[in-house]
């Protein structure tokens, strides 16, 4: 395929595989940022993870992807080393990895916790040597022409969740149960509208049904969590 066609192919790959959590690997951070801008212009919500981000930004990015607030994470190999995220159902190698060990590490993201998934590698005629190396190592690879990809135009690439930030965490003795109670018994939110709760030392992140975000921001800002008011906003 042509390099210029890679970006426009990604929505088709996602919809064809009905993917909800997509990890895209690029070899360089400049490619990550360019691809993120291009996909955003196509109407997709994306996050990036590379070495230009400070550790706090990396941690927050991982939280927002792992709690399903954003469906797509674009990452470099260095930044994603040691990354533990379950339920990734599609890995796309936008750039082919530089060796088979990195390739193994990438595609293994879809098999965590005994779960399956799909890994797709995009390549051009300039990648011939790397393609042959990967084929020699992974004998069960199936090659497919881009013309055979069946795009499901009815599939919506989006997340049902968004995340709220609370400026209090473990150092303020906050626990997941405290936040859950403030949202359910406190402001009347249903448990099914609340997703993953991540509590760090000085901050907490809560995935919320995006249809309820405005309500939660308004009501929780006026309510106490474990006897104290906290600053709350959407990430």
Model regions: which residues?
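Conserved helicase RecA-like core
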Residues: 1-235
């Amino acid at each position: 395929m042509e390099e210029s066609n890679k970006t426009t192919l990604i929505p088709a790959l996602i919809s064809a595989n009905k993917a909800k959590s997509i990890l895209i690997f690029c070899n360089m951070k400049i490619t990550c940022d360019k691809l993120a801008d291009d996909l955003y212009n196509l109407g997709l919500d994306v996050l990036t993870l590379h070495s230009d981000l400070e550790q706090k930004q990396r941690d927050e990015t991982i939280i927002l992807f792992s709690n399903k607030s954003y469906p797509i994470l674009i990452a470099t190999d260095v930044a994603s080393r040691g990354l533990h995220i379950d339920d990734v159902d599609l890995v796309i190698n936008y750039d082919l990895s530089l060796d088979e060990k990195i390739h193994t590490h990438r595609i293994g993201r879809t098999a965590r916790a005994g779960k399956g998934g799909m890994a797709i590698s995009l390549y051009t005629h300039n990648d011939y040597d790397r393609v042959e190396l990967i084929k020699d190592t992974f004998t069960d690879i199936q090659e497919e022409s881009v013309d055979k990809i069946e795009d499901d135009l009815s599939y919506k690439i989006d997340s049902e969740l968004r995340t709220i930030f609370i400026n209090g965490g473990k150092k303020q003795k906050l626990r997941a149960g405290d936040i859950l109670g403030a949202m359910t018994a406190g402001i009347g939110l249903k448990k099914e509208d609340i997703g993953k709760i991540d509590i760090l030392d000085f901050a907490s992140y809560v995935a919320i049904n995006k249809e309820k975000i405005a309500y939660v921001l308004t009501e929780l800002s006026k309510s106490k969590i474990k006897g104290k008011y906290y600053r709350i906003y959407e990430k």
